[in-house]
């Protein structure tokens, strides 16, 4: 998803767990909150925890969602500058089809991520 905003600004906003509820519907619905166990949200499957990559200068926004089953789902995400001194960037979120996930469920996951990234773009571009 291309965003017509400087990569540093996009990274700053997207890397702040407190802002996730404004653009990531799945976590917004679950009421992402900081607890003694870390960032936690309620999901249709039960309570999940979300572990975020440490703040970095490379635009890496990877995160791990731990499901109630104990399964850890790794979500690679990047803010990639359009070039040196760029005033725009591409946000890349890799969605993988895990074992046991049907094609329909996978397609729904892809659509949900695309909608979340569209929300992020709209917020940051002021649309």
PLM segments and residue spans:
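Beta-strand/loop substructures that line and gate deep hydrophobic ligand-binding cavities in soluble
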Residues: 65-126
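Hydrophobic pocket/interface hotspot
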Residues: 10-14, 20, 39, 52, ...
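Short beta-strand segments that buttress and anchor functional surface loops
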Residues: 37-44, 61-68
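Short, exposed beta-strand/loop patches in secreted or surface proteins that constitute
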Residues: 30-34, 41, 52-54
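Generic structural detector for well-ordered beta-strands
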Residues: 2-4, 51, 78
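Hydrophobic ligand-binding cavity/cleft-lining segments
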Residues: 1-33
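Short acidic/polar mixed-charge low-complexity motifs
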Residues: 44-48, 71-73
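Short, conserved beta-turn/loop elements at beta-strand boundaries and strand-helix junctions
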Residues: 56-60, 84
């Amino acid at each position: 998803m291309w965003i017509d905003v400087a990569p540093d600004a996009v990274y700053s906003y997207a890397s702040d767990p407190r802002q996730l509820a404004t653009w990531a519907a799945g976590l917004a619905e679950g009421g992402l909150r900081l607890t003694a166990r870390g960032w936690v949200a309620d999901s249709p499957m039960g309570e999940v925890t979300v572990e975020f990559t440490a703040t970095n200068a490379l635009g890496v926004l990877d995160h791990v969602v731990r499901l109630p089953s104990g399964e850890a789902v790794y979500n690679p995400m990047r803010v990639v500058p359009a070039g040196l001194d760029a005033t725009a960037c591409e946000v890349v979120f890799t969605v993988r089809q895990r074992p046991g996930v049907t094609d329909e469920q996978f397609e729904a996951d892809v659509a949900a991520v695309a909608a979340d990234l569209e929300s992020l773009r709209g917020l940051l571009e002021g649309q």
